[in-house]
């Protein structure tokens, strides 16, 4: 197997994939992005197999024993055609998360590379987290389909390099109570006592929506706005609230299927 030594250092700078605020830099280790790691793997496409799905070790050298999650911040796929410039055809290349039943849903990034483009580099921003236990099973593969490349079986028309920028952390929930409390502590230049956090804790539970289905099953679920008789006043016996139930109504989340890419 041939190995490509193309440097991707400039393409994998963290600031190209994620914006780090001053809060992120000051947060305790449990909440912050702990490491930026550039991991590379190599794959050579053989003409004998015109369509292949090759396992890729994106996290080679990453210590996942101390953290719960790993986030794929950026992926750079580089390649060189090992054929004459007059060669026709090309290849379709995709990085696939094989945990998904459907290849289409598991596709992280996908692009086409004509053989007339001698050397190429494509950058993508997946930016999604994976549980460390799943990541240890190396669930990623490289899908390659050759099209109209006139080379005999058993030869190697294309060399590919996959580089991945990842971050390891123990917390990925940014809109939960923990993150809200920690941000209050970091934003203050004075020592914080637990009582002073009530200004953050209580409003957090108040603003979490409760769906009509939950209300129908258990009338004791009420938001504070329903138990407040006026500004700064409460009923003498506010209804009990159960805080161990997750909200069934969440804000809408949009998924973009167009991943950012840079061609060089």
UniProtKB/Swiss-Prot annotation:
GO molecular function: RNA binding
Cellular compartment(s): Host cytoplasm, Host cytoskeleton; Host cell junction, Host plasmodesma
InterPro entries cross-referenced by the UniProt entry: TMV_movement, Viral_movement
Chief location: host cell
Keyword RNA-binding: yes
UniProt-annotated stretches for the region Disordered: 219-264
Secreted found in the keyword field: no
Gene Ontology annotations for the cellular component aspect, listed alphabetically: host cell cytoplasm; host cell plasmodesma; host cytoskeleton
Domain of life: Viruses
GO terms of biological process kind: transport of virus in host, cell to cell
Keyword terms: Host cell junction, Host cytoplasm, Host cytoskeleton, RNA-binding, Transport, Viral movement protein
Biased composition (Basic residues): 231-240
Family: Belongs to the tobamovirus movement protein family.
Entry function: Transports viral genome to neighboring plant cells directly through plasmosdesmata, without any budding. The movement protein allows efficient cell to cell propagation, by bypassing the host cell wall barrier. Forms a ribonucleoprotein complex with viral RNA. Binds microtubules and modulates microtubule stability. Can bind double-stranded DNA.
Protein name in the entry: Movement protein
């Amino acid at each position: 197997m041939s190995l490509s030594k193309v440097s991707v250092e400039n393409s994998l700078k963290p600031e190209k994939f994620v914006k780090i605020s001053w809060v992120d830099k000051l947060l305790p280790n449990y909440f912050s992005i702990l490491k930026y790691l550039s991991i590379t793997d190599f794959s050579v496409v053989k003409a004998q197999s015109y369509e292949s799905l090759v396992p890729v070790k994106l996290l080679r050298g990453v210590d996942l024993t101390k953290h719960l999650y790993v986030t794929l911040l950026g992926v750079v796929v580089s390649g060189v055609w090992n054929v004459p410039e007059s060669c026709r055809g090309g290849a379709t290349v995709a990085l696939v998360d094989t945990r998904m039943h459907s290849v289409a849903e598991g596709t992280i990034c996908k692009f086409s590379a004509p053989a007339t483009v001698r050397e190429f580099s494509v950058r993508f921003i997946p930016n999604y987290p994976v549980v460390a236990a799943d990541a240890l099973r190396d669930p990623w593969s490289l899908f390659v389909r050759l099209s109209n490349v006139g080379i005999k079986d058993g030869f190697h028309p294309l060399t590919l390099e996959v580089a991945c920028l990842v971050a390891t952390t123990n917390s990925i929930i940014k809109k939960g109570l923990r993150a809200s409390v920690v941000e209050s502590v970091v934003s203050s230049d004075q020592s914080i006592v637990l009582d002073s956090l009530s200004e953050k804790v209580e409003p957090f539970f108040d603003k979490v929506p409760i769906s009509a289905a939950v209300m129908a099953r258990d009338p004791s679920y009420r938001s504070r706005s329903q138990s407040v008789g006026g500004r700064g006043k409460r009923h003498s016996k506010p209804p009990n609230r159960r805080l161990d139930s997750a909200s069934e109504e969440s804000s809408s989340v949009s998924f973009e299927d167009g991943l950012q890419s840079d061609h060089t």
